[in-house]
Every structure is written in C-alpha cells, then in structure tokens.
Amino acid sequence: MLNPIVRKFQYGQHTVTLETGMMARQATAAVMVSMDDTAVFVTVVGQKKAKPGQDFFPLTVNYQERTYAAGRIPGSFFRREGRPSEGETLIARLIDRPIRPLFPEGFVNEVQVIATVVSVNPQVNPDIVAMIGASAALSLSGIPFNGPIGAARVGYINDQYVLNPTQDELKESKLDLVVAGTEAAVLMVESEAELLSEDQMLGAVVFGHEQQQVVIQNINELVKEAGKPRWDWQPEPVNEALNARVAALAEARLSDAYRITDKQERYAQVDVIKSETIATLLAEDETLDENELGEILHAIEKNVVRSRVLAGEPRIDGREKDMIRGLDVRTGVLPRTHGSALFTRGETQALVTATLGTARDAQVLDELMGERTDTFLFHYNFPPYSVGETGMVGSPKRREIGHGRLAKRSVLAVMPDMDKFPYTVRVVSEITESNGSSSMASVCGASLALMDAGVPIKAAVAGIAMGLVKEGDNYVVLSDILGDEDHLGDMDFKVAGSREGISALQMDIKIEGITKEIMQVALNQAKGARLHILGVMEQAINAPRGDISEFAPRIHTIKINPDKIKDVIGKGGSVIRALTEETGTTIEIEDDGTVKIAATDGEKAKHAIRRIEEITAEIEVGRVYTGKVTRIVDFGAFVAIGGGKEGLVHISQIADKRVEKVTDYLQMGQEVPVKVLEVDRQGRIRLSIKEATEQSQPAAAPEAPAAEQGE
C-alpha cells in the first residue's frame, strides 16, 4: 500500500506541500515538493560503501525541467529533452553550493541528487522549490548530512523586502536575491541588484534567512515522521603518530614555501616538498597509504596559511589583509573588434571583448517559464593554459557557465535600455591567466570593453572577491583573494557594483558561524576595494566613447504607418528581401511601424531609408508624378510611379485625341508624366497622361512622410 506522508505550510504568499512515501521507493529518499502548482520531484541515492581509493566526495546534483510540466512538447528535432540548458545548469549549481559543505569531512561515499520539474506555475520559479526538495530528501535519507537547509528568494519593491516574489513582482523589483542556510547560519547567497547599498543587501540576506526558518522546522517535523535511520558512518580515526611524523618532516619547509610570492615557483616548491616527504615516509614504512599521506600534507598546508593570516602576518604573496594586487588596465587592445580591454590584477588576467549586433542576433530562449529574448549575452571561457595546465577544450563546463552568469548579473544593472541603444551586445571574457577571482576580473574587463565599444552604460562597474579565515572568535577578512586563499579559507564572497551601489553579490560559506557582523565587515571592506579598482579603471577610460566602432553596424530608426508594413515586407517577404540585397543592409520591422536599418556604411543606410520612404509614400489624388512604363496592353499601359506603386493609364487617357494603338504613343521603359485620377478601395490607381500634359505644373516625385532618424 502507498502511504504518503504530507506536510503543508504557508511560506510568504505561497502554500508549500512536502510529500514522501508515494513514489520512487527504491531510492534512498524521495520528496515531491509543490509551491502553488509548481512541483519538483527530488530523489537522493547514496552508496553505502565508498569506492576503494576514493579521495574526494563524489556528490552529483542534476536538475532537469520536463516540458510536460508546462503542457508543451519539446521543440527539438527528436521532440524530447536533451542535454541540460544553461538555466538548468545554473539551478543545479544553486542546489549544490549550500548542501556540499554540510556533508562531514572524510565522507567519500557517492551521493546523487536528481531534481525533476514535473509541474510549473509561470509565476513561481522552480529553483527555490528544488532547493527545498533537495534539503528535505537528504534529511530524510539517513545519509550523514548536517542539514536541513532552507531557501528563499528576496525581492525589494517600494523600499520593502518581499519574500518569494512572483515573476510579475520580480519585474518591479530592484533586487533578485536567493539565500540558503541552516537554522543557525547563512551558507549561500546569489543575487543581482539595481545598485543597492551595502546595508540594503545585508538586510535582504538577514531577512531571507529569518523567513526560511519555517522551511527548516517543517522539514525537521517530516523527518520525525518519515525519516530513515541515520547511517552508522564514522570518519577514519586520526593517526596522531603519523600526523606528527609528517609535520616534523614537512611543516617548516611548507611554511617557507608559502613565503614564495610567485605562484608557479611556489607550486613547484610545494610539489617537491610533498614528493620528498612521501618518498622518505614510504622508505621508512612501505605499507603506508600514499593518499592518506597526501591528505595529511594538505591539512598541514591549510594550517600553515590560515595560522599565518590569523596571526596578522603578511599573506602568501606578501600583502596585508586589505591590499589589492597590482592593476594594469588597457583598452582598445584588439584593432578590429567593436570594443576590447585587457584587465590584469596580479596573476589574474582577462581579455574581454564587446560585440554589437542587431535585434536579429538576440538569443531566443524557450524556457519552461515561457519564451524570452535576451539582448545581452556574456560568455566566460577558462582555458587550461590560464593555470599552466593541459586539458580538454570545447563546450563550456558548469563552472564557466556559472562564472559567466555572475559576471553578466554584475553588468546588467548599468546596461542601457533597448529603446535608447537598440543593439544586441555580446561580451566574451577569455581568462588568459588565473590566480583567484577571474569572474570579477571579467566584470572589470567587461565594463572597460563596453565603454571602449561606445555602449552608453550608466556607470563603470568593478568586482572584487573577499575571503575569510576564522578560528573560534578570531577571524580575518581578506580582500582580493588568491586561488589558494579561496581553497584554504572559509568563505568566497564576491561583490560587484559601481560607485553608487552593488549590482551583484555571490557568497559561498564553508563553515557555520558566519555572523551578520562578519558579513558587514566583508561588505564594507569590499566597497573600499571596489572604489580603488574603479579609480584605476577610470584612468584608462572614464566614460563610454562618443561613437561606436567603425566596424560595428550603425542602426538608423525611422517610423512608418503600421498599415504600410505589409508593403515593405511584400508577398512572402519578397520586397524586404530585395531591399536587403539591393542596399546591403539589415532591415527589421516592429509591429508599431518602427523600422531599424543596420549598416556599416552610412550611404547604404541612407539608400535603404530612401527606398522604404518611397514604398510607404502616400499617393495623392490630383498630383502629377513622373512614372515609367512597365507593361503595355491593348486597353492601355501600366506605369510605375515609385515606391512599388503601379497604376493604369487607360487608352482613353494617353492623348487628347483618339488612340488606335498604344505602342504608337508609348514604349516599354519610357518616362512619362502622369496625373493620379483615383485610388479605389482596393488600392488600384487610375492615371492620366493626357491630364498631366495639360497641367502647367512640373512633375513631382512621391512625397514621403517625415521620418525620425536616429543612431
């Protein structure tokens, strides 16, 4: 018999339901979580035994959206879901980041979390639902997990924090922040904001953490009812004697090695020390496990770096806690790109380009929440050579997608509106060197490249990565962390923004006990660092260039009568296709009659505008035009009068005397003056050569409506 156990509770304006025991009973744990018709089915499977020789924790989080959840069939050729989209990858990372630190150290059994979206309400994003589901499933499973966690989205509307805003509310919000944490501590923050202050951002984090306590309470209640017995797992006992022997051989040498400021030289020396230490110990006792020795050495490394920081000594590269590495900022480094910059901070370097395109270059995203068009693209590439390694090169990995998204969020707040700058913009960051905080180097480089491209961004933005070392009540916040400080520290805290405020905040915390005060110190220290970097960037370029690159397409805008759109497009697109080929431009027409002409050559754009104006010109009854004979028939001749308009001159209207044969008076291609006698309801035009020649006024070209033209 199926005996589902259900808990239901109010979460802000939404009702959340947790249900277990109904489906996937062979999984270690399974939960169906729903929030106002958005439902995510989350399963967890954990292996009871670790693989022999396993030296890392193999946690996999898969998040997958099924189109049936929105009542649709996939649009792909095979009509089924394929590889994860960028959005699915980002949500998988969002689930992974707060749960990973909650597994005990030394636990290396394989664990897989699969979250499947099975129903979606377009107003309720499935990401928070999936995070709650992962927390509940892990808590029910009995797998060693120091949860549960809660998750909340926080908006900021009319100077008020809003818990789990709907999609419509988010459009009005100055903030989109996701926070996750345990009952006692915040573990993860991901956000984008419209240049809010440090206090407003910190307030949002605290608000979200307070509100999500109801989620944690209800998961705990569900575990009491339906939870499986906790696994009898114990970490391997610590070999104190072996630890002491390894420390005696290596600690002093590693301490000296970590005074070498050059990364490659330091790594080489550390590798030598490790190799020699392991060789010495294996010579003494060949039964020792090499992996275990490596773990002990890593723990010593970590202790060396952390204890030095806590003692107030200089950091690995000799800096004080709040010092920024040396900066080198250059713009216009690539001659044929629309905008480019090379941003170097210590041993981290990003080559960033900005490319301008038309609306046709925008990315159309067919997402579960509905189709949308993205006119700002940000791609981050992290090749293996950036850290002096070899490796696979190809499609972006999860980390590259995540870093690109963070950098994009950082810049989004200062991008111009499409009606003021009607371009699709693509930014690409190539990480050419990396030793910590390459995503924030990408933000700085993007700001510089956009200004170099003449994109009228509202303000320059810069990003900085902060770190933390904490033992008991003693803690030190580090500015502009190195890769080693990120790896060996307790927090990775990235902040981006302008002089006015914060545009993005990302926080990953590896320990519990990070207080509001510590976050306040980190935010304030980050502000000082951000302003310092902006000052250096402004010396290279302090405002967007006055004009876009000569190699970028220039977009000219004119307005036509919406009723005339069909005339410009033509049957089956024939007219607009011919216009594009004739003028060498790209032409886009919107439903309100806005026409955008993109061309790298100003003369080509003017030619296209002139032709469109001719096509859309109103024919005035009683006016005389100069036309060209296009067709001769027994009863008269057809004459083109410009703009694709053609009218009939009846045989009786050719001359002021009887005409027996049309060809006696008119030849194909002949230019003749014609007067418009009538335009009937079907748009057919009656013309007269006879009346035109009788009039004394000179012939006129079709008159076009006044056009708005802008760049």
From Swiss-Prot:
Protein residues bound to Mg(2+): D486, D492
EC nos: 2.7.7.8
Class in the EC hierarchy, top level: transferase
Main subcellular location of this protein, as a coarse class: cytoplasm
Its biological purpose: Involved in mRNA degradation. Catalyzes the phosphorolysis of single-stranded polyribonucleotides processively in the 3'- to 5'-direction.
Record text on subunit structure and interactions: Component of the RNA degradosome, which is a multiprotein complex involved in RNA processing and mRNA degradation.
Protein's UniProt name: Polyribonucleotide nucleotidyltransferase
Organism of origin: Shigella boydii serotype 4 (strain Sb227)
Taxonomic lineage: Bacteria, Pseudomonadati, Pseudomonadota, Gammaproteobacteria, Enterobacterales
